Amino acid sequence: MVSPSSPESNDDDDLTNADSAITPATSTITTDSPTKSSFDDYQSLSSIRIPITRRITPSLSPQYEESNISTTTSATTTTTQQQHQQQQLQQQQQQLRQMSSLSASKIEQAKTDVLNNKKISFIHRFITNWLIMDPNLISHYNNTNTRRFKNYQIENQGQSNFIYFLGGRLHTIKTKYPINLITLSLIIIPGILYIIFELSWQWRNFSPIIVIIFLYIWIISIFHFFKLSTCDAGKLPKNIHLPKKLITITTTTTTTNDNEIDHRNNYKVMGSPPDEYFNTVTLPYWKTNNDNNDNTKISKLANAYHSHGVQVKYCGTCHIWRPSRTSHCNTCQQCILNHDHHCIFLNNCIGQRNYKFFLWFLLYIVIACLYLLIISILQLCHYKFASHKESEIITTFNQSIKTHPISLLLLIYSCLAICYPGLLLAFHIFLTSQNITTREYLNFVYKKPSKSTDGGDGTRGFVNVYNTHSIWENLYINWLGKSNGVSLTFPRDYYHQGDIRFANIEPLGTFTNK
């Protein structure tokens, strides 16, 4: 009798035989060595082998399959990254070739466009456009909502030597070595040391009025320093006297981000100006009558030098006829009224509008140093005049120095600091007593007379026509009586389009050729 389970067992045997028949074929496909494959590219073999393995051998190890897939995927990813890097490299090389083909002006224009497209916050504009303003960076603010600029913002069309503060109210000169900051520190540090270490002792042992007087002199000296360092010394407007027929005007039109059209005029002086632009015009200061004058020293001087009066010259850099006693400062690149000198310790010119403050500044500095010197000596020697209790604590000068070391430091500082301001004050007292400027004294009085300036009797050709022949009157004019005047450049007024006073024009041709 046949068992019921016989057909089932036969079926199992058939399945087993079928599996054994398929397995070698599968093994042949999955165990082929890549080096012995008929394919030339192993990467192509791997990409074809994966679907065949999945279809024929579902019983393969999952770990083997995952490793095989990850190897293929990583190879594909590496190839894609390399292609992407090559594309980026090609794009960069193409951009470099395009940039090299551009001229310098186009590159600068591209940089300006990038800056204009950049949105600037209100705080950034407030700090860099009002609190501290450099006219050379005005292109950074072309995308502001308001198109009205101040004169100080457009000065020289981005080639200004000044930095403005508080909306054009104050200014200073851009310099590589800010010596004025060192000067300010030399004024502030001694006062701070005095306040910290000596003020309370002198308030108790001397008198409060002594402390108050020193603090007043110290504070007013700092005020005069800021006044001198940041005020207008008497700048004159530029480009007032230009030969119109020699001016070439070109208009550049640009469109801003606010869809507004900005017109900017470019000026250039072509050719050589007339000869009168390079002559020195002398205005006579004295009229003499040879028949009525005796052969005195004054009459000889007047007759010999009556033509050497007030000289008026043309400034080829500022393009203006300079008034009398006006000179061009190479540091400020401005013509200054009644120009005395350019002070590197204040980083500003000394002229008509701040010369009086300069004189009082020197006086206050000398008084402050002298006052500090005296009270420091009194504090160090106070033990000799003190009460019995204090004299028992401090009995010698060495003990006093150990007790008050800052007083000794301030004493030494005062002795050193009073030297230069004291000599400078004495020199300017002499100049103001003659009503003459430093520039006139060094150029015409101090230097040796030449044949062109010597009248034959050993006297110099320069005659100070501004001298009132009264020392007290000259001192009063310079220290108290002279008016500071008003600013002639109006930096805080609104800028009007096409105002040639604030344009950047090259010096006249004859000046550049010589």
Curated annotation (Swiss-Prot):
GO molecular function terms listed in the Swiss-Prot or TrEMBL record: protein-cysteine S-palmitoyltransferase activity
Protein name per the record: Palmitoyltransferase ERF2
Pfam families (UniProt xref): DHHC
Domain-related comment: The DHHC domain is required for palmitoyltransferase activity.
Subunit field text: Interacts with ERF4.
Cytoplasmic side: 1-176, 227-356, 431-514
Known EC number: 2.3.1.225
Post-translational events: Autopalmitoylated.
Origin organism lineage: Eukaryota, Fungi, Dikarya, Ascomycota, Saccharomycotina
Subcellular compartments: Endoplasmic reticulum membrane
PROSITE patterns listed in its UniProt record: DHHC
Family membership: Belongs to the DHHC palmitoyltransferase family. ERF2/ZDHHC9 subfamily.
Catalytic machinery residues: C343 (s-palmitoyl cysteine intermediate)
Limits of the DHHC domain: 313-363
GO annotation, cellular component aspect: endoplasmic reticulum; endoplasmic reticulum membrane; Golgi apparatus
Region feature Disordered, mapped onto this chain: 1-94
Low complexity bias (residue ranges): 19-37, 44-60, 70-94
Organism: Candida albicans (strain SC5314 / ATCC MYA-2876) (Yeast)
Function: The ERF2-ERF4 complex is a palmitoyltransferase specific for Ras proteins.
Membrane spanning residue stretches: 177-197, 206-226, 357-377, 410-430
